[in-house]
Every structure is written in C-alpha cells, then in structure tokens.
Amino acid sequence: MAGCRGSLCCCCRWCCCCGERETRTPEELTILGETQEEEDEILPRKDYESLDYDRCINDPYLEVLETMDHKKGRWYEVVKWTVVFAIGVCTGLVGLFVDFFVQLFTQLKFGVVEASVEECSQKGCLALSLLELLGFNLTFVFLASLLVLIEPVAAGSGIPEIKCYLNGVKVPGIVRLRTLLCKVFGVLFSVAGGLFVGKEGPMIHSGAVVGAGLPQFQSISLRKIQFNFPYFRSDRDKRDFVSAGAAAGIAAAFGAPIGATLFSLEEGSSFWNQGLTWKVLFCSMSATFTLNFFRSGIQFGSWGSFQLPGLLNFGEFKCSDSDKKCHLWTAMDMGFFVVMGVIGGLLGATFNCLNKRLAKYRMRNVHPKPKLVRVLESLLVSLVTTLVVFVASMVLGECRQMSSSSQISNGSLKLQVTSDVNSSIKAFFCPNDTYNDMATLFFNPQESAILQLFHQDGTFSPITLALFFVLYFLLACWTYGISVPSGLFVPSLLCGAAFGRLVANVLKSYIGLSHIYSGTFSLIGAAALLGGVVRMTISLTVILIESTNEITYGLPIMITLMVAKWTGDFFNKGIYDIHVGLRGVPLLEWETEVEMDKLRASDIMEPNLTYVYPHTRIQSLVSILRTTVHHAFPVVTENRGNEKEFMKGNQLISNNIKFKKSSILTRAGEQRRRSQSMKSYPSSELRNVCDEHVASEEPAEKEDLLQQMLERRYTPYPNLYPDQSPSEDWTMEERFRPLTFHGLILRSQLVTLLVRGVCYSESQSSASQPRLSYAEMAEDYPRFPDIHDLDLTLLNPRMIVDVTPYMNPSPFTVSPNTHVSQVFNLFRTMGLRHLPVVNAVGEIVGIVTRHNLTYEFLQARLRQHYQTI
C-alpha cells in the first residue's frame, strides 16, 4: 500500500493502487487528465476524493442541536440569507471588474490598430498595423497563459470542474482564492487578446469560488485572512453556497436570474431542495441588479436606471414600422427552425468530436512536456488567430454601401440598431461611404458582432457569412482547451448567429421569403449551435428568453434546443461531459441504464475492508492511517462465541465487547427502557431476559499485534484475539470473518482526534477521555491535518481512542440483494460518500463508493455477470 498514489475515498485496498505514472500535482492532473496507452477511452481515475454531503449525526452534532433554541435557529437563517446576498453582490462586482477592463483593453487595442490601418492604407505600411495587432494580442495571451501556469485549474471555463464539485467530487484547488484571481485576470487578458473565447463561462467558475470562500471568512492561499467564523464549516453548507455562486455567475453574465437558477439545477447541482431554490434565485437576483446598477451608472451616467442587466445584451427584437409584412416569426417558420436545430446538433457534434480529438492530442503530446510548451501553444493559437482575422478582413471582406442612417466617426461607422444599442461598423480598406462587412465582424468585440448579426438587416453578404462561420468555427474549436481561461458560450452564440443569418439571407434572396425577420433566424441559429455544443434545454431556453426580453420566442427556442440536443446526443455527449470524461472524473449521471438492474449491491461492492474497532490503540490507528489512503473506515466488532474468555484481564477487548452488547437493541430491552421511563416495570420474566443479555463480563489481557503485521508489510487487519495471529496462511473464512457494523468514521475525524490528544489510558475508563465539541472538530475545515505531519513522539502508542462519540452511528446502508438502480439512486440523491452493505444479521459485507457506481465500472461488472451465466 505504500506505493499507492490515491483512492476514491473508499475502504477497499486493492482498488486504490495505481501503476507508476509521471509526477504531476493534483491540480495538473485535474485539468490535464490522464491517458491510457493501450486504450483510447479514458476511464475514471480512482484517486479523486469525494465530498461529505451526508450529515454526520454524532455526539458533537447532537450537542449543538441541544443548545440550538428558536432564537439561535432564526439567527442562523438570517446569517445564511445575508451571506447569500453578499455572494450575489460580490459576484456582480467581479463581473463588473472583468467587463470594465476588457472594454478598456479592447478599446485601447482597436483604437491604436484602426488608426494605424487608416493611415497605412494610404501609405502602404499595413505590415506595421499587423505587427501592432500581434503585439497587443500576443502580450495579453502570454499574460493569461502565465496565470494558468500559476494555477492550472484556472484554465478553460471551469464549468466541468464546478459540475464535478457539485456532483460530489473534490476537485483539487477548484475553489481557492488563488484560482479566482488567476481566473478573473486571465479571462480578461484572454478576451482582450483577441482569442475566440468568452468571459461569460468563466463567470460561473468565479461565482462558485466566491460562494465557496465568502462564507468561510478565511483563505487557504492567504492564510492570514481568517476571522474564525463559526458557521457553515461543512461540505454540505459549502455545496449550497457554491450552487448559489455558480448561478449568480451566469445571472451576471446574461442578466437572466431565473435561467441561472435552472442552469444550476440542470447542469450543475446534483442535490437539490426547496429551500435552496429560493436562496439560489435570491443570489442570482442580487448579482444581476448589482451588475446592472453599476454598469448603467458607469456607461450611461444614469445611476439607478438599470439599463444593462448583464454582460451580454441581445437588444430588442422588433420589425421596422415601415415593413408591414414583417413578423418576428410565423407558424411556417417552425419547419425551418426544426431543420436548423438538426443542423445545429450536427455542427455541435462535429465541434465536440474535433475538440475531443484535440484534447486527447494535447494530453499525449503537449501536457507531458515542460510547462513552457503550453504557453507556446497558446501563443501559436493567438498568432494564427490574429493573422486570420487581419488577412480575412483585408482580402475576403466585401465593401458594402452604407445605409442612410450610418455615419462616419473616427475611422469607423456608427450605426443605430433597432435595439437602441450603438454598434460600430468598420471601413477597413474600403472607399468612402462603404464599409467592410468581414472587418465589422472580426474587428469588433464579440458581443457587438452578435448585435450586428441580430439586428442589422442586409448588411452582410452570404459569402462573407459563410467564410466567417467556417473560420470562426475552426478557430474556436482549436482555441477551447488551450492553457488560458476561456468560455464557450459567446463563441458558440456568435458562430451560430452567423449560421442563422446565412440561412435568412438565403431564404430571402434565393427563395423569395421576404416576410421573415433576419434577427429571429440569427437568434435561432445561435440557440441551435449552442444547444448542439453544450446540450442544455430548459435552462438555456429561459436564459435566451430573458436575454431577448421576448417571451414569444419561447416556443421556437425550446423546440430548436430540443432538436439540437436529440441530434447531437445521437453522436456524442455535450462538450462539458466530454471534458469531464477526459479528466477521468467519476461523475454520476442522473440515473443508470435499465440493464444494470441485473446487478446487485453484492456484485459491485468491495468486500476487502479496512476497519477500526470502537476502542483502538493509537499505535494501531496511526499504522492504519499511514499505510492506507482510505477516507473512511467502518467501526466494527467481531462476532465470537467465546468472548467471555477473551475479556479476562484486557481492558481494550472488554470495552469493545461491552460496546457491542450495549449497541444491540432487542424488543424486550426497548420495552424495559420505556417502562422504566414511565416509573413502571415489566414482568419479572422480561427483566430476567434483559438481565441475562446485559450481564457484566470480566476483562483479560491481550497483546497488540499491529506493529508486527506492519513490519511484515502486510496488514490484513489488527486482530484482537490471540488465537488468530496474523498470518499469510489465513483461510478465506478467517480473512473475511463476520464483523458487526456499528458506524463509519472519517479519516479527517481520526486524525483530528490524534492531533488533539483525545484518548485514555488502559488503566482508566473511557469516560476519562477528553471530549471535543463540534466547533473543535470542524476548526481545521477544509484543510484537515495530514497523518504524515503528526509528531509521533508526542503520542503514547499504548493509549486507547474511543471513536464511538465521533463516528456516524446511523449511515445509510443497503442489503447485499439491493438492485443497482436502487443503490445508485440512494447514493446520488442523498449525496453519499460511502454506502456500507450490511446483511440481515447486521454484519458489514462490503462498501460501495462513487467509483463502484461509475458507468465504466458497472459495464465491466455487467460483462463479468454475462460471462458467469
């Protein structure tokens, strides 16, 4: 076991060992993933740690409940709602910060380059303009890539990682303050650097980090930031705040608080309740109105007007008053929308397939090399993107006549769109009174380009739209996955909007459907491609409706997204699920396949257990913790017929056997307890039965054998009984002897007990053992001490630890005959980390963990099942 690299929080021994792999940090493994040389598919890694979403109702927790009166309960709720509001406000301010500096850097870059292009168009020095554009873009991308080297998990959008976190997987470094700083600064440099990425996706990750860190009032990265805030010191509470923060991020990005709430439910959170719904919606509203308030005041000088609800504004869709035949959409258009949904699904599947191949190539050929290679790859993508943008605008663009409402302003043309939002059109390389349609799309911020496609009628030729779509599609696919913070929402929307606008132009010019509204088709195209890539339906429908502020678009958007999802699902998964799979994360889907019910809990559990006794010596606990990597241990006692002989003279064995007897509940014993509590007594016969069961036992002496087993590098388990000394010649019955199950205790709890000296001497009773409060047990959360950092010289190895007050005495359990679908539903819906399998007489026979419920593991077990039939 010393060579094991990690485990999926399970209590099995053999399944946690890994082969030798190259040395990488947990953060690098998280973002880079691992590949298998012989197999093309990437299986879930077993060294991911799960989160404790199940509440541990032990003695310290019950003591808290005893002191929790109505007033404290109300105060706790007030604090929780206040924290939720603060998360929303802070997420909105993060969005404001990113948007402000992205606009600042983008305006600086385009201002310098446009002035140079205007001057060099006449002097013939366009190469100088290209060098200036390259200088800006390469510098910004270089800074973004350096930030990812500082914190590798800051790369990408962060949505796959947050999805895994909310699913119950502990992703290293995903919600650190350092990750937030690298993400925020990195994404503004990525967008300002001209890469085909968006800032809206990383807002979800940023909001999640704010939600995770703000309620803790401390930081792992900056350890001096600590206020000893006593609340919300558990994974269960943090999960709810991360859900709220992620929703606040997308609400700030799109100005869609209801859609953001649904997004957190549909794509993110695996565990949900009614109270969380209100808190997530309130947090989303807080983020939306915070961002709206400050953006409206800064941009328009109209504080309190609330004119800009999100980072991405789609504007108002309406037909011209002079065009009486125009309609936003008609029933006849639904057929075109369905076809566009099919094409969007095909394009999305193609995008995902290409990006998956690129990601695998990077994992095999880029990531194993020195970190500088990842920076060079990012610079290469930036270089190619800049060259394509500049050359395409100069060579492939068409000079089109300005409309009468257009006017020249500082080398660009200002055009008032129907949504009352000013968007600039570019006159690059074109004579007076004309503009370059390709440059208008490439030399504008992506949000402005989307507005151009949504609201400008007849300003782009079909050839320009087709070329722009192909170039943007390929470059966006290549860009997603490089070592910079990047989002995928806006690139997918812009690429899809060009596709929809192309369809509208073809229908108008070549089929003669003059009544159609081009903006509607552009919106449907954007929805089709985005839905084909990310495969979301409900939340994306509401987000787009809220962004357009047009409820009549609800039906066509929903149908388009459904068709795009069905079409794409026929070929592959959504882009986020693909990247989750590439990282080997044991993500649990919503449900298992029907055929998995051919398996039972006994088929998938791990029977080879590492366990502890209710009373165990420090020497044994330290050895177990240092020689295994499991994150929880069953608390058990052994079933023997001659227990009285072994109790003589040994306090440790006596305490364990007494605990076992006291934990056995009988109907007669319960009736006696109830009768005594009512000042009445049962019959003498019933008393005799109970007295016989709880008869006192005499203790005996016994030798601790754990150190001998540890020296032999073989630890089946420290056996307390002298007639069964550890031996490699044990029979199967001896190795898997019956064990009565009493509860579960976590590794973090055991280490905390050892660090704080919670133990008692063999010459004393267990009542003399110091007691820890709930606050003391959770004080080191979320970074509990490591057993290897423990100073063993401060511990007496012969002292005994009573773990019973701190274990979870009533975890969820299943019987060996429980069908896999029932095991899966219980594990997933209750947010479990470990699921003991207990037989009909209360003996633990195995443990089910997250790894045992992954699709790949179940498929392997199903194949074995078919082979044994």
Curated annotation (Swiss-Prot):
Residues 605-662, 807-868 form the CBS domain. Its main location: membrane. A motif (Selectivity filter part_3) lies at residues 487-491. It catalyses: 2 chloride(in) + H(+)(out) = 2 chloride(out) + H(+)(in). Residues 159-166, 241-253, 257-265, 519-533, 534-536, 537-548, 549-552 dip into the membrane without crossing it. It holds the Pfam family CBS. Keywords: Antiport, ATP-binding, CBS domain, Chloride, Endosome, Glycoprotein, Ion transport, Membrane, Nucleotide-binding, Phosphoprotein, Repeat, Transmembrane, Transmembrane helix, Transport. It is found in: Late endosome membrane. GO terms for cellular component: late endosome membrane; lysosomal membrane. N-glycosylated on several asparagine residues. The record marks 200 as: Mediates proton transfer from the outer aqueous phase to the interior of the protein. The modification Phosphoserine is found at residue 773. Belongs to the chloride channel (TC 2.A.49) family. ClC-6/CLCN6 subfamily. This is H(+)/Cl(-) exchange transporter 6. The lineage of its organism: Eukaryota, Metazoa, Chordata, Craniata, Vertebrata.
